[in-house]
């Protein structure tokens, strides 16, 4: 017998049979070795063939093991194994069967048929397991589908549809697909295209996450329920698994053979199968190698002849990039656009999916949570599409509640830790012999007893609440299964079964659910089982960093006293503080315009009056860290070409992939304070970019992505008009301030374009600082020095005269508060540093600072 006349799978089986014989110390390869290997062969056709023929495979496997155990063993030396006479006889019989059926190569199924006819022990075992020759022959005919074995790899190409596709209609029948709500127009349009005589291959095109795959699943459900035209009623909808098709294709031509097998199977089905190719663009170039043909080109003839009835799905970008370039492939498909659903449609979709998700997580999802998921995701998650992002929100919020139910409640956990701590102390005290320790042990035992009782009671409550929840979940699962059984009975027209489920099983289960729900009516103390709008808002906050959850009392008070908090750090600029505080409060209460930034301001004033300091104080107030502020020094953008740094380089330029400085920062942190410092120093083209940010709250970066600025506060600072401010300073009356503001606005209007000024929420002119305010600022700045000294365990105590001296030295109406910082450095910090180095002050000392002869003097208290 020639080995090269066996199919590759049969050759592999023979090699594995030899290994099996060697491993079991057998000197001869018997038919049982080969049959045993064929039965366990990965991807082989022997096991499916026997199952199809009604053979009891587990019983057969036991009998084969018994036969293998009974074979004689040779140990102690390595011997060559050779085929037995019985195996050779069976191979001759297999060869004869193959030739009778017109095969060029011997396939494994003829070996199975030869064994059934055999009178040996293996044949008897097979017949004892229920094998009959006629049934085996019928199963072989079905497996081969009228084809002969003409190539070595013929066995691998068999049942290609079962191997490389997923049956969506079968999944719909078993209730494994999520319900598809709405999308009637798109499904109708898809059916319309499928019903055409030619070009009957729709391709669904839309943004990621709008529900392209869901439309195909909806079509599968309609086919199963018979809610489609007559022409589609008996068809199967299969999804091509491209990963399985490519996986393990090691040699050139192997992938093409597999795809050809799929196409041949489809041709044999004569239009009874619709093939769904998700991510259609992956077919263009798949399997492409030097001199080879890619999958896209292999599909074209089948599509043109009408042998392949296909639905594709891909995104707009991928369609343009891959499919449109191949005009011959594109013309064989008919485009069906899938748009993003509205918020109202998304709410309807979520209501339809609610039961599935509630059942999966074992929690209750309330309707306000569904509405919140749709509205909040639409407003705050801008880089993804509905309904995908809303479904993800609902899913994650339900997952969070489930996690809290499964994990130990915080109160119980705290009690348990306290108990462990006390028990450790008890063990330590048991070793002590003195009376005081014995008394403490008695007290400790009493405390442990009280805590133990409290812990046991709480744990019992927690377990009973969990059990109540799980009981209701089990009933809901039974109701879901009963509904699936009812649908299956309806399709089979089994009216007796339908009547039994509809009027017997379902009402009984619903009565049980009502009883379980009434038992749950009491408020759960430790377990929360409902997903509310608040949980959805918390998930949005975690995703985006935007605080959309309900404000706690502490935060409300904090926002109401915002002016006072900012005023403690920024002195003498009450108007600016009020304007900024109002913008933050509007944003936090949801009253600000949803299509514009939370606030956009231009701060004007001379140097050193607190423009940048107010932004730092605001960042610390909002985010507990002044590092959360996005600060851009506009003096870096003085050249025309430097504008590209803000939004990213255009295509074809170096740095295109990196994105823009401003846009990337805001994409990562959408809720932030953006400070554009010294804005008048930037090139005029920068303001053209800022126009759409200030008006629509959005900016398109170099890669075409839209970046959302609607949750940012934009502050620009400028020194324009500082000369006019200095000239009119010295009088704090409202009339003078109005006159000063008008003079400054004249300068501003001369420098900035009207369309830029018109888009700002407010232009704030900062007041010059007087001596009293400089003294206040000195106190604030000295607090920083006190903190630094505290690290060295030193305290600082300045009397009023010393503070007065620093205020006088640091006061300069032209330069604001910056000279004060220099005065503190030169008058106080330099001298104090020398004193500390000289050993005048050591850890634990208090440094008393006074004035003597117009100079600061230091003494130890």
Curated annotation (Swiss-Prot):
Annotated stretches, region: NBD2: 555-768
Coiled coil: 391-525
Start and end residues of each Clp R domain: 3-146
SMART domains referenced in this protein's UniProt entry, alphabetically: AAA (SM00382), ClpB_D2-small (SM01086)
Keyword presence, 4Fe-4S: no
GO CC annotations, alphabetized: cytoplasm
One Pfam family hit: AAA_lid_9
Stretch list, region NBD1: 159-340
Region called Linker, residue ranges: 341-545
C-terminal, as annotated region: 769-861
Cited Gene3D superfamilies: 1.10.8.60, Clp, N-terminal domain, P-loop containing nucleotide triphosphate hydrolases
GO BP term, pick one: cellular response to heat
GO function terms (MF aspect): ATP binding; ATP hydrolysis activity
InterPro entries according to UniProt: AAA+_ATPase, ATPase_AAA_core, Chaperonin_ClpB, Clp_ATPase_C, Clp_N_dom_sf, Clp_R_dom, ClpA/B, ClpA/B_CS1
Keyword presence, S-adenosyl-L-methionine: no
UniProt keyword list: ATP-binding, Chaperone, Coiled coil, Cytoplasm, Nucleotide-binding, Repeat, Stress response
Stretches the record annotates as Repeat 2: 83-146
Compartments, record wording: Cytoplasm
Annotated residues for binding of ATP 2: 605-612
Region spans: Repeat 1: 6-71
Biological role stated in the UniProt entry: Part of a stress-induced multi-chaperone system, it is involved in the recovery of the cell from heat-induced damage, in cooperation with DnaK, DnaJ and GrpE. Acts before DnaK, in the processing of protein aggregates. Protein binding stimulates the ATPase activity; ATP hydrolysis unfolds the denatured protein aggregates, which probably helps expose new hydrophobic binding sites on the surface of ClpB-bound aggregates, contributing to the solubilization and refolding of denatured protein aggregates by DnaK.
Assembly with partners or alone: Homohexamer. The oligomerization is ATP-dependent.
Entry protein name: Chaperone protein ClpB
Native organism: Xylella fastidiosa (strain Temecula1 / ATCC 700964)
């Amino acid at each position: 017998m020639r080995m090269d006349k066996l199919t590759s799978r049969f050759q592999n089986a023979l090699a594995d049979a030899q290994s099996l014989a060697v491993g079991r110390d057998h000197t001869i390869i018997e038919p049982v070795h080969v049959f045993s290997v064929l039965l366990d062969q990965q991807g082989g056709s022997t096991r499916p063939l026997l199952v199809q023929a009604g053979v009891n495979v587990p019983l057969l496997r036991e009998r084969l093991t018994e036969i293998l155990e009974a074979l004689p063993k040779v140990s102690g030396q390595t011997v060559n194994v050779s085929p037995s006479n019985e195996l050779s006889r069976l191979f001759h019989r297999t060869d004869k069967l193959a030739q009778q059926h017109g095969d060029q190569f011997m396939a494994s199924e003829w070996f199975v048929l030869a064994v059934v006819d055999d009178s040996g022990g293996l044949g008897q075992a097979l017949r004892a397991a229920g094998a009959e020759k006629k049934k085996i022959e019928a199963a072989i005919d079905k497996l081969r589908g009228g084809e002969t074995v003409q190539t070595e790899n013929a066995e691998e190409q068999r049942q290609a549809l079962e191997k490389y596709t997923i049956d969506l209609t079968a999944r719909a029948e078993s209730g494994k697909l999520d319900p598809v709500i709405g999308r009637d127009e798109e499904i109708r349009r898809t059916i319309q295209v499928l019903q055409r005589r030619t070009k009957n291959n729709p391709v669904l095109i839309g943004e990621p996450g709008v529900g392209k795959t869901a439309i195909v699943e909806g079509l599968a459900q309609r086919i199963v329920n018979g809610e489609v035209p007559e022409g589609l009623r008996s068809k199967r909808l299969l999804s091509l698994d491209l990963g399985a098709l490519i996986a393990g294709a090691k040699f050139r031509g192997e992938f093409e053979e597999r795809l050809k097998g799929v196409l041949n199977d489809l041709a044999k089905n004569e239009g009874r199968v619709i093939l769904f190719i998700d991510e259609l663009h992956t077919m263009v170039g798949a399997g492409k190698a030097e001199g080879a043909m890619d999958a896209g080109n292999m599909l074209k003839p089948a599509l043109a002849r009408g042998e392949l009835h296909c639905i594709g799905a891909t995104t707009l970008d991928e369609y343009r990039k891959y499919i449109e370039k191949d005009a011959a492939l594109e013309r064989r498909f008919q485009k069906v656009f899938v748009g993003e659903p509205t918020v109202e449609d998304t709410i309807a979709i979520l209501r339809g999916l609610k039961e599935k998700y509630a059942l999966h997580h074992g929690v209750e999802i309330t309707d306000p949570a569904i509405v919140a998921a749709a509205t909040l995701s639409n407003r705050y998650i801008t880089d993804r599409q509905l309904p995908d992002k809303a479904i993800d929100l609902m899913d994650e919020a339900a997952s969070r509640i489930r996690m809290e139910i499964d994990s130990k409640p915080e109160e119980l956990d705290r009690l348990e830790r306290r108990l462990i701590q006390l028990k450790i102390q008890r063990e330590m005290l048991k070793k002590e012999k003195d009376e005081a320790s014995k008394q403490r042990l008695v007290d400790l035992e009493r405390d442990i007893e009280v805590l133990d009782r409290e812990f046991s009671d709480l744990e019992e409550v927690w377990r009973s609440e969990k059990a109540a929840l799980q009981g209701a979940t089990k009933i809901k699962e039974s109701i879901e299964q009963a509904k699936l059984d009812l649908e299956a009975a309806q399709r089979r027209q089994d009216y007796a079964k339908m009547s039994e489920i509809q009027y017997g099983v379902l009402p009984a289960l619903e009565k049980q659910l009502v009883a379980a729900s009434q038992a749950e009516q009491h408020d759960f103390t430790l377990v929360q089982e409902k997903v509310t709008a608040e949980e959805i808002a918390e998930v949005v906050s975690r995703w985006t960093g935007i605080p959309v959850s309900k404000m706690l009392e502490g935060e409300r008070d904090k926002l109401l006293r915002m002016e006072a908090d900012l005023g403690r750090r920024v002195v003498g600029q009450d108007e600016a503080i009020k304007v900024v505080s109002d913008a933050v409060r509007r944003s936090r209460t949801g009253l600000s315009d949803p299509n514009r930034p939370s606030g956009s301001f231009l701060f004007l004033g001379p140097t050193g009056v607190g423009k940048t300091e107010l932004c730092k104080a605001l960042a610390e107030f909002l985010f507990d860290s002044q590092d959360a502020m996005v600060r851009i020094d506009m003096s870096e953008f003085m050249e025309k070409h430097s504008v590209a740094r803000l939004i990213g380089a255009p295509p074809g330029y170096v740095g295109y992939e990196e994105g823009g400085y401003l846009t990337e920062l805001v994409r990562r942190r959408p809720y932030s304070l953006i400070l554009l410092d010294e804005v008048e120093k930037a090139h005029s083209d920068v303001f053209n970019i800022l126009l759409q940010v200030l008006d629509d709250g959005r900016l398109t970066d170099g890669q075409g992505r839209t970046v959302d600025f609607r949750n940012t506060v934009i502050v620009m600072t400028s020194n324009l008009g500082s000369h006019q401010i200095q000239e009119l300073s010295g009088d704090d009356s409202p009339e003078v301030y109005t006159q000063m503001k008008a003079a400054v606005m004249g300068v501003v209007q001369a420098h900035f374009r009207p369309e830029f000024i018109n888009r700002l929420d407010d232009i704030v002119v900062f007041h010059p600082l007087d001596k009293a305010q400089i003294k206040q600022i000195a106190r604030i700045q000295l607090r920083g020095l006190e903190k630094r000294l505290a690290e060295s365990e030193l305290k600082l105590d300045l009397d009023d005269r010393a503070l007065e001296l620093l205020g006088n030295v640091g006061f300069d109406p032209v330069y604001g508060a910056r000279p004060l910082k220099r005065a503190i450095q030169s008058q106080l910090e330099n001298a104090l540093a020398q004193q500390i180095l000289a050993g005048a002050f050591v850890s634990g000392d208090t440094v008393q600072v006074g004035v003597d002869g117009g100079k600061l003097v230091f003494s130890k208290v």
